[in-house]
Amino acid sequence: MKVAGLEILRCDAGWRNYHFLKLTTDDSIVGWSEFDEGFGSPGVSAVIERLAARVVGQDVFDHERIFTELYCFTRPAAGGVVGEGLGAIENALLDAKAKALRVPCYVLLGGKVRDRVRVYWSHCATWRVNHPTLYKPAITSLDGVKALGAEVREKGFTALKTNIFLYEGGKPRGWRPGFGVPFLPELNVDKDVLRNVRTHLAAMRDGAGPDVDLLLDLNFNAKTEGYLKILKAIADFDMFWVEIDSYSAEALGYIRRQSPHPVSSCETLLGLREFLPYFREQAMDVAIIDGVWNGVWQAMTIVNAAEAFEVNIAPHNFYGHLATMMNAHFAAATPNLRIMEIDIDRLPWDEEVFTVVPQFENGHLVVPDTPGWGTEPIEEAIKAHPPKGPGGLLHYRRP
C-alpha cells in the first residue's frame, strides 16, 4: 500500500487554528494526524509540503524507514519545526497502517495496558481569563476561580492544572513573560508575583476541595532563582506537580533537588537525544512528551528510556480532539504513565469538526477501540470554519 498524496487542512480554533494532515493511499485508505503551528512553531505546514514528494510512492507500512530517511535529508536542521513536520507525517502513516490492518493504533505500539487514562483539566481558568469571548463563563474575579474549581470537582475530574495570574483591582491578568506577555525578558519574579500565585492557588483549592489534585504550570516564565522563589512561596500547598521547563538539565536538576513538590518537564523537547541529559541528571519526576510533535512511534522510544531511568511520563496534549485521541492511544500503550493532559474548555463548534469526540468516566478518558486513531476531522465542517490569519502565540498583542 503506497502513499498517493498528502494534503494539509486548517480550520478556525478560536485563538488559534487547528491543523490536520490528510494522507491518502493508492488503496483509498486515508490516514490523519493533527499538528500545531500556534505554539511557537510557525512553518510546520511548509516543512510537510516540502517533504511530501519524498513520501509519495513509499509503502505506508514502512513508517520507520520513511521517518529515518526524512531525518537524514533534514539532519543539518533537525528538530524544531522540521522535527514537528516529521512527527505529523509519522502519525498520519500510523493511522493509515492501523486502518489497513483494521486495528486501533495502540496495537501498533505493543497493545494497550489500560482501558482508561486518568486526565487533568489543563489551562483551568486560563482560557476563561485570556479568551473570555470564546470560553464561558468568563472569569473576572477570584469568585470565578473558586466556581471553576468547584465545577472541576462536580464534573468528576480529579486533577486540574492552572497558570499564574496577577490580580489588579481584583481582576485576573495572565502573567507569562517567557512568552512575551508581558514583555519582561529578564524573567525576574518579584513579591507581587509570589503573593498572586498564592492567592490564585488558594482560590482554586477552596473551590475544588481537598481531593482534587492541583498542578501549576511555570514553564519558561522564570530563571532558576525565580523558580526557587515560587516553590518556596507555595511550599505549604499540596501540589501534584509543578511544571518547569528549563533549557539547562543541570539547572532543572538543581531546582528539583530543592523543590518541596514533584517537578514535571520537557514538553518542548524533540527526540530521545534531547531528553537524555534530563534523564541522566534526574532532573524531573515526570517527563512530559509531546507525541504530536515527536510522532507517537518515536515518542515510545522516549517512554522506554524514561523507564530505564525510573521516570514516569505524561503526554502533552492541549490541541483538538484528534490529537487527544492520538495521545489516548499513546497513553494506553505506555506502562510508565503518570497522567494525561487535556483541555476541557472547548469551542462551541469543536464537536462539529470531528466524527467522534472523547468520552470520560470519573475523570478518565476512555480509550477508543476502533481502527486507527478512533476519530477523523470532517472536511465539510472544516470548510464551514475557515482558518483565521495569524493564530496562536503570534496573535497575542504586546500589552
Predicted stretch roles:
Residues 46, 51-53, 65, 232-241, ...:
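Shared catalytic-loop signature of beta/alpha-barrel
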Residues 1-36, 346-353:
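Structured beta-strand/loop patches that form or line metal/cofactor-binding pockets in enzymes
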Residues 373-399:
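Extended hydrophobic packing segments that form well-structured cores
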Residues 3, 28, 51, 89, ...:
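Conserved, mostly hydrophobic/aromatic
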Residues 26-101:
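Metal- or metallocofactor-binding catalytic centers and their adjacent structured scaffolds
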Residues 116, 120-255:
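Metal-dependent enolase-superfamily TIM-barrel catalytic cores that perform enediolate-based chemistry
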Residues 1-14, 103-117:
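N-terminal amphipathic alpha-helix/helix-capping segment at the start of soluble metabolic enzymes
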Residues 21, 26-27, 32, 100-103, ...:
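Ligand-binding pocket scaffold of soluble enzyme catalytic domains
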